[in-house]
Amino acid sequence: MSQLMEELSFRGLIQQQTDEEGLTKLLAEEKIKLYSGFDPTADSLHIGHLLPILTLRRFQEAGHHPIALVGGATGLIGDPSFKKAERSLNPAEIVEHWSDKIKGQLSQFLDFEAGENPAVIVNNYDWISQMNVITFLRDIGKNFGVNFMLAKDIVSSRIETGISYTEFSYVILQSLDFLNLYRNENCKLQIGGSDQWGNITSGLELIRKSEAEGAKAFGLTMPLVTKADGTKFGKTEGGAIWLDKEKTSPYEFYQFWINTDDRDVVKYLKYFTFLSKEEIASYEEKVQTAPEKREAQRRLAEEVTTLVHGRESLEQAVNISNALFKGEIKSLSAEEVKVGFKDVPSMEKSSTEELTLVDLLVESKLSPSKRQAREDITNGAVSINGERQTDKDYVLSAEDRIENQFTVLRRGKKKYFLVTYK
């Protein structure tokens, strides 16, 4: 077995492959071109895309040539794989904009300037848009029997609820991608999530029927990322975890990984980091002997946040996390307060206005009445920027404003309110 296949196997990154022996032999003998596709269904990739992206990177680090395919054409159609209902179609100009954004994100993970094996980005709109309907039906469509299509899980799962010809044809378009890359780039391997198995094997079938006898290509899928508690990976109460820091801040991103269940953390270290077997084994032992220290979760969060957002964003996320945990909010910069408390209720005040703590507690609804507010203060339940305040007649001063922009109020352990200044 090649060193790369051993690595992928150790990390649990192989769900299915079309010809294990053939692919193992090929990877041991030559450096190949491989691809994975990413349809632009939003203006950012999310953490569900990380597994195929990082697997492309593992292949590149082993000397192979990764191709990242942006589905500018297939994104206009919509992949029906394991979707319960028809997707709504997005306007072409929006899909084009999303495609450009995704290209930029992919460049964070793959090396496009590597001397021996630079990564390449392609867009399937470039070849699919050039093919007319007659050519498509005669040269491509004739290779797909209706019974063959209906037997695919991606189609059969939708027969009862209904599937349009548009989505029915998606698998053919994706197969055309593989054929095009095989012919023009000598690309011999497609990788993807386990939900892409039907699309990948259809592409292999098209290559077999369209090319000369002996043409050989391969498919490999990675497992569906699951969580031990049964909830969907990559989703929180606030929605998807995006790779774009404008949609999911580095702090929120870091917190997602910090909150990983003990039962999942070793698996995620294998999936999403480039730590060695020995390092992962040491964290596995720490999970078993001292789970309360959450050292494995911290390392996971550090590694993935650095991969996606860089060292500077990681440091900011750690600063915010530590300050909130220790109550040292005053140590944060205004930018860090803005990021860390972006989902906290807030109100705007003038920096010249006299603000009593009692009035702020009532206006912010942290306390239901002035009487209760005074009791909360004297009982030590109220803090300003993490520092307890017990003077019921306290009036806020300039020293209570972080960089003259924010004051963070807290009542009890978890009720926060943000005062901003104009």
UniProtKB/Swiss-Prot annotation:
It is found in: Cytoplasm. It holds the Pfam family SYY_C-terminal. A motif ('HIGH' region) lies at residues 40-49. The lineage of its organism: Bacteria, Bacillati, Bacillota, Bacilli, Bacillales. L-tyrosine binds at Y35, Y170, Q174. It is an enzyme of class 6 (ligase). This is Tyrosine--tRNA ligase. A motif ('KMSKS' region) lies at residues 232-236. Its EC number is 6.1.1.1. Catalyzes the attachment of tyrosine to tRNA(Tyr) in a two-step reaction: tyrosine is first activated by ATP to form Tyr-AMP and then transferred to the acceptor end of tRNA(Tyr). Residues 355-421 form the S4 RNA-binding domain. ATP binds at K235. The keyword Aminoacyl-tRNA synthetase applies. GO terms for cellular component: cytosol. It catalyses: tRNA(Tyr) + L-tyrosine + ATP = L-tyrosyl-tRNA(Tyr) + AMP + diphosphate + H(+). GO terms for biological process: tyrosyl-tRNA aminoacylation. Keywords: Aminoacyl-tRNA synthetase, ATP-binding, Cytoplasm, Ligase, Nucleotide-binding, Protein biosynthesis, RNA-binding. InterPro entries: aa-tRNA-synth_I_CS, aa-tRNA-synth_Ic, Rossmann-like_a/b/a_fold, S4_RNA-bd, S4_RNA-bd_sf, SYY-like_C, Tyr-tRNA-ligase, Tyr-tRNA-ligase_bac-type. It comes from Bacillus pumilus (strain SAFR-032). SUPFAM superfamilies: Alpha-L RNA-binding motif, Nucleotidylyl transferase. The keyword RNA-binding applies. One of its GO terms (molecular function) is tyrosine-tRNA ligase activity. Homodimer. Belongs to the class-I aminoacyl-tRNA synthetase family. TyrS type 1 subfamily.
